[in-house]
């Protein structure tokens, strides 16, 4: 899988094709994070082939839909449990991110795993994604934003065009630290 662009959350439901021995096969539902529906279907079959003894040729997808974010304007803390294959073996990991949507947090996770651990998108498997309370956060990079009196520096100021001359004899200085 290529984790291109912002990843979206899809709910994919599939089953084995009905047969004489099994007229009503059970349904299997998964939450898949992918850039589009085609990749979501592909990942569904990949995971199902690992878990159950059937594949795309002996099964069918009943439904696929994109899960919309419940509150896309409220920032949330996300806990992500994942498994990834590195050059030295398979590792389990828990990571925390702050974002507006689940898809945004998972996209951040894929980018972060690629940067910090050189993990490719196809070798990362998201086990669980959960919204966590501020009191339950463990990672300092997430906890630093829970301060109500947090202040951000303004490292670069932009000159307003009203006060600028038409011609200048030197380049403007925008750094005031």
Curated annotation (Swiss-Prot):
UniProt key word Ribonucleoprotein: yes
Domain of life assignment: Eukaryota
One Pfam family named in its UniProt record: Ribosomal_L18A
GO cellular component: ribonucleoprotein complex; ribosome
InterPro entries reported for this sequence: Ribosomal_eL20, Ribosomal_eL20_dom, Ribosomal_eL20_eukaryotes
Keyword annotations of the record: Ribonucleoprotein, Ribosomal protein
Biological process annotations from GO: translation
GO molecular function annotations of the record: structural constituent of ribosome
Family label: Belongs to the eukaryotic ribosomal protein eL20 family.
Name used for this protein in its record: Large ribosomal subunit protein eL20
Organism of provenance: Spodoptera frugiperda (Fall armyworm)
């Amino acid at each position: 899988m290529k984790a291109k662009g912002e990843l979206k959350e899809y709910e994919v439901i599939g089953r084995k094709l009905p047969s004489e021995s099994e007229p009503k096969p059970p349904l299997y539902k998964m939450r898949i994070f992918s850039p589009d529906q085609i990749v979501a279907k592909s990942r569904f079959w990949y995971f199902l082939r690992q878990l159950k003894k059937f594949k795309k040729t002996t099964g069918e997808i009943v439904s696929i839909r994109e899960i919309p974010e419940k509150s896309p304007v409220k920032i949330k803390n996300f806990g992500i449990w994942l498994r990834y294959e590195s050059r030295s073996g398979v590792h389990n990991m828990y990571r925390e991110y702050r974002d507006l949507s689940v898809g945004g947090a998972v996209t951040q996770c894929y980018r972060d795993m690629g940067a910090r651990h050189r993990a490719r998108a196809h070798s990362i498997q998201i086990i669980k994604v959960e919204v966590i309370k501020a009191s339950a956060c463990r990672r300092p990079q997430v906890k630093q934003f829970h301060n109500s009196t947090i202040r951000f520096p303004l490292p670069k100021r932009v000159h307003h065009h009203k006060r600028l001359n038409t011609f200048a004899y030197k380049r403007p200085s925008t750094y005031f630290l």
